């Protein structure tokens, strides 16, 4: 079947005011749950592997081979984007492109804006030459991401405008108050800044750290141009809670397939719930003609 680039999917989502969910792969069974959830809802889906998890999953080529085989064996018909999340370097992004990923994120948000722009431009030039989409980041999303703690640094409107103009990225992750991991208290997104950035850049925005954000805020973010919403912690909590219950109720069981079954079912259920919440259900039909890698 092949993977589709992210850019045209996000353009459609932004135009029609819905968002496509990004769900992180944490192994083969998780990938099956994500794909099955998207297929059941007839929604495009972004299956992501964070750079710090690539080696755990077996490497770039292993991830591409696994996801390609699964989409074929499971008869997946909806558009699937295979995305590198939080690419750590230019070289790692290029490796993902060469391996067959259809989208990459270069995370240069920890660098000064000039360096972030220069490095992102190099990634964009290489990726676009291979029909691969690119997401960039300005500002810093707080919380824990793959073992690294980051403080929130709000994106600057003028820096975002300059970043998009000079790099030609397909999507922008602008840090606006969300955090990776669990929230302490109710999340408070910067909607005034969000509106200004959306108006000045005119590219699809990406909301990182969306697990746990109330629906009212998510819907407002979608209306203000967020066409991609990243969910990982919510799936992990659903999985771990279900697995803990299974282990407690079946103390003598030892077969992994049975012990993990309910947890994986909860991952799929969470994917389906978020797709509906984002308004992406039944949006796959208009994407059949997309060029695939």
Swiss-Prot record:
Encoding gene (name): iolJ
Keywords of this entry: Lyase, Metal-binding, Phosphoprotein, Zinc
Biological pathway: Polyol metabolism; myo-inositol degradation into acetyl-CoA; acetyl-CoA from myo-inositol: step 6/7
GO BP annotations, alphabetical order: fructose 1,6-bisphosphate metabolic process; glycolytic process
Lineage of the organism: Bacteria, Bacillati, Bacillota, Bacilli, Bacillales
Function statement: Produces dihydroxyacetone phosphate (DHAP or glycerone phosphate) and malonic semialdehyde (MSA or 3-oxopropanoate) from 6-phospho-5-dehydro-2-deoxy-D-gluconate (DKGP).
Residues bearing PTM Phosphothreonine: 233
PANTHER family to which the protein is assigned, alphabetical: D-TAGATOSE-1,6-BISPHOSPHATE ALDOLASE (PTHR30304), D-TAGATOSE-1,6-BISPHOSPHATE ALDOLASE SUBUNIT GATY-RELATED (PTHR30304:SF0)
Matching InterPro entries: Aldolase_TIM, Class_II_FBP_aldolase, FBA_II, Fruc_bis_ald_class-2
Record bears the keyword Metal-binding: yes
Name of the molecule in the record: 6-phospho-5-dehydro-2-deoxy-D-gluconate aldolase
Residues at the catalytic site: 85
Amino acids binding Zn(2+): 86, 180, 208
Key word Metal-binding present: yes
């Amino acid at each position: 079947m092949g993977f589709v680039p992210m850019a045209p999917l996000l353009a459609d989502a932004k135009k029609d005011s819905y968002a496509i969910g990004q769900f992180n792969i944490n192994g083969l069974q998780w990938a099956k749950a994500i794909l099955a959830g998207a297929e059941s809802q007839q929604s495009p889906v972004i299956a992501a592997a964070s750079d710090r998890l690539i080696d755990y999953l077996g490497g770039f080529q292993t991830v591409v081979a696994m996801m390609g085989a699964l989409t074929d064996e499971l008869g997946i018909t909806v558009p699937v984007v295979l995305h590198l999340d939080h690419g750590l370097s230019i070289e790692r992004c290029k490796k993902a492109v060469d391996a067959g990923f259809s989208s990459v994120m270069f995370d240069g948000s920890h660098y000064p804006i000039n360096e972030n722009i220069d490095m992102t431009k190099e990634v964009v030039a290489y990726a676009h030459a291979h029909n691969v989409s690119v997401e960039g980041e300005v500002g810093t999303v707080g919380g824990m991401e793959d073992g690294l703690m980051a403080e929130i640094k709000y994106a600057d409107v003028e820096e975002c405008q300059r970043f998009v103009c000079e790099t030609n990225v397909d999507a922008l992750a602008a840090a606006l108050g969300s955090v990776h991991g669990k929230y302490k208290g109710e999340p408070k997104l910067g909607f005034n800044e969000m509106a200004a950035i959306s108006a000045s850049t005119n590219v699809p925005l990406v909301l990182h750290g969306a697990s746990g954000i109330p629906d009212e805020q998510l819907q407002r973010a979608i209306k203000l141009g967020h066409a991609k919403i990243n969910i990982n912690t919510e799936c992990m909590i659903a999985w771990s809670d279900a697995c803990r219950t299974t282990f407690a109720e079946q103390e003598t069981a030892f077969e992994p397939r049975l012990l993990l079954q309910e947890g994986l079912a909860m991952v799929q259920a969470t994917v389906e719930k978020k797709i509906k919440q984002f308004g992406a259900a039944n949006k796959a039909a208009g994407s059949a003609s997309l060029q695939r890698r």
